[in-house]
């Protein structure tokens, strides 16, 4: 069974506090220079985890990822005619 997950972008002041974020979800990426981390969390626990994370003193800002809500099926996608011709020739 697949669980719907969503990313949280956490902006912080010090890199050493990343260990505390690991208990709330999967830390996918952490940037040392820009001081942010991307954490994946179950969508049904999203509100609770976001409130817990924003209450940490080292966190400056929390943003939700909009990736699950972006449409990825395109209606007006036109195929390349040259590629179709090559596939029909059997090259």
From Swiss-Prot:
<dbReference type="GO" id="GO:0005737">
    <property type="term" value="C:cytoplasm"/>
</dbReference>
<protein>
    <recommendedName>
        <fullName>UPF0298 protein OB1449</fullName>
    </recommendedName>
</protein>
<dbReference type="InterPro" id="IPR016979">
    <property type="entry name" value="DUF2129"/>
</dbReference>
<keyword id="KW-0963">Cytoplasm</keyword>
<comment type="similarity">
    <text>Belongs to the UPF0298 family.</text>
</comment>
<dbReference type="Pfam" id="PF09902">
    <property type="entry name" value="DUF2129"/>
</dbReference>
């Amino acid at each position: 069974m697949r669980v719907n997950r969503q990313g949280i972008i956490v902006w912080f002041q010090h890199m050493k506090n990343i260990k505390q974020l690991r208990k709330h979800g999967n830390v996918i990426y952490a940037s040392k220079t820009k001081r942010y981390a991307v954490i994946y969390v179950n969508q049904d626990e999203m509100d609770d985890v976001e409130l817990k994370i924003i209450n940490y003193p080292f966190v400056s800002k929390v943003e939700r990822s909009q990736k699950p809500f972006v449409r990825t099926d395109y209606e007006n996608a036109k195929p390349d005619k040259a590629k179709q011709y090559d596939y029909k020739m059997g090259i």
